[in-house]
A protein has these predicted regions:
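Absolute protein N-terminus
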Residues: 1-2, 150
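Alpha-helical assembly-interface signal, strongest on the long, hydrophobic N-terminal helix that forms
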Residues: 2-73
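Short, conserved structural patches
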Residues: 48-150
Length: 150
């Protein structure tokens, strides 16, 4: 059995060294965008939970601060790589009534809960900005839910 010619002995290592950066780029890209999708699902579900708790028939209705607390509690699973973890920005409109006499007055009207979150990329943030002009780091993820009062 003949061995490899002397010129071919290091070819596999060189080929692997050439392809390794592309494989790592794909691997980390899949991981990074998986985390972005996870965070998007978290804020979408958080806005739904906030709206659902706000429109449920209770007397007195939840206040804006209580609805924001529901969204904040649901958002604790967000993944961030920033030095200081970003806090989601929560907007509730219209402002729920605060008096007991107005409990049923909003029946059928909509309550909007909006959540936005700034995701900082771990690896690809500034790299993608070179290739895509509309890409920004941090990436702002947002979700809005509208539900009618019961």
């Amino acid at each position: 059995m003949m061995g490899l010619p002397s010129k071919q002995k290091g070819a596999e290592i060189i080929e692997f060294a050439l392809i390794l950066p592309f494989l790592l780029f794909i691997l980390f890209g899949i991981m990074e965008f998986g985390i972005v999708l996870y965070d998007k699902a978290i804020i979408t579900n958080a806005s739904r939970e906030g709206a659902r708790s706000g429109v449920a028939f209770k007397c007195p209705l939840l206040t804006t601060a209580q609805i924001q607390a529901v969204v904040t509690n649901y958002s604790t699973g967000l993944v961030s790589f920033a030095a200081v973890a970003a806090v989601p920005v929560i907007t509730v409109t219209p402002t729920p009534p605060t008096t007991i006499t107005n409990c049923g007055a909003n029946s059928g009207t909509g309550l909007t809960v909006s959540v936005s979150y700034s995701y900082n990329f771990l690896i690809f943030g500034n790299l993608f900005a070179l290739f895509a002009s509309g890409f920004t780091n941090p990436l702002v993820l947002s979700a809005t839910t509208v539900m009618n009062y019961e």
